Design a protein with these regions (language model features):
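Short glycine/proline- and aromatic-enriched beta-strand/turn motifs that initiate or cap beta-hairpins
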Residues: 36-82, 215
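Residues that define the transmembrane beta-barrel architecture of outer-membrane proteins
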Residues: 39, 69-75, 113-119, 134, ...
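Membrane-embedded beta-strand positions of outer-membrane beta-barrel proteins
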Residues: 43-47, 98-100, 138-142, 172-174, ...
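Transmembrane beta-strands of outer-membrane beta-barrel pores
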Residues: 49-53, 81-83, 102-108, 142-150, ...
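Extracellular loop and loop/strand-boundary signature of outer-membrane beta-barrel proteins
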Residues: 61-65, 107-110, 156-162, 197-204
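Residue-level signature of outer-membrane beta-barrel architecture
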Residues: 81-83, 125-127, 176-178
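Gram-negative (and chloroplast) outer-membrane scaffold detector with strong preference
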Residues: 86, 93-144
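Repeated loop/turn-to-beta-strand initiation elements of outer-membrane beta-barrel proteins
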Residues: 86-88, 182-186
Length: 215
């Protein structure tokens, strides 16, 4: 019996030792993988010029300016990170990147709409490689926009598209990514944008644009 107990204790210690060795190997490999796949951080600027879809009477001319609202413009500051090009993880995930952005918008009617600011998260990846330096990418974003001048029965009765000072921001688009150098690249493409409160507050016809972007 004592021999069996000693034998069991020795087996238990051996299993514990093997588990510790295996754990050390896993941690060592994880550290190496993390060191090899350290993230690349990027800071970018982007300008957009857009067309406003006339989905409401307010946008079609029933506003204080008595004119159709067709154009929008915005400026964006964006931070993103990704895995180094050429690594196994980068190839698996299609050169994906993610980050946060800050956008400033002007729709040509500051008195009735304001000049909202959007804070959003975004993610993108390569759709297809055209040349070693040129690729077709997609990008989408989701966040919140602040600083709208919403509908008010007395002070802002024409604005039937926004019923709140804070509204959701959604975007999706494609662009060409041209790698100019290891530190700089150029993006040119189109982005569809939607602002609304998601029918949680009325009126809420929302605002939709299609933008040309460069950055």
């Amino acid at each position: 019996t004592r021999f069996r107990e000693r034998h069991d204790i020795m087996n238990s210690k051996m299993r514990t030792g093997r588990a510790m060795i295996l754990l050390m190997i896993i941690l060592f490999l994880s550290d190496n993988i993390c060191a090899q796949d350290a993230y690349i951080h990027r800071l970018g600027m982007e300008g957009r010029a857009g067309y406003i879809f006339p989905t409401s009477s307010f946008l079609r001319g029933e506003n204080d300016m008595r004119k159709i609202m067709r154009s929008a413009c915005s400026a964006h500051l964006k931070y993103s990170f990704r895995l180094p090009p050429g690594t196994a993880a980068d190839r698996i995930y299609g050169s994906s990147y993610q980050g946060i952005g800050l956008g400033y918008f002007d729709f040509g009617n500051r008195r009735e709409m304001g000049t909202p600011v959007a804070l959003y998260a975004f993610q993108g990846a390569r759709i297809a490689g055209i040349t070693p330096r040129l690729s077709l990418n997609y990008e989408w974003g989701f966040g919140a926009s602040f600083g709208w001048k919403p509908y008010d029965y007395l002070s802002n009765p024409n604005n039937t598209i926004m019923g709140s000072k804070v509204n959701a921001y959604l975007s999706a688009g494609i662009h060409l990514n041209w790698i100019l150098s290891p530190r700089f690249d150029l993006n040119i493409g189109a982005t569809a944008v939607h602002f609304s409160k998601g029918n949680t507050r009325y009126p809420n016809t929302g605002l939709n644009t299609i933008d040309f972007k460069i950055g």
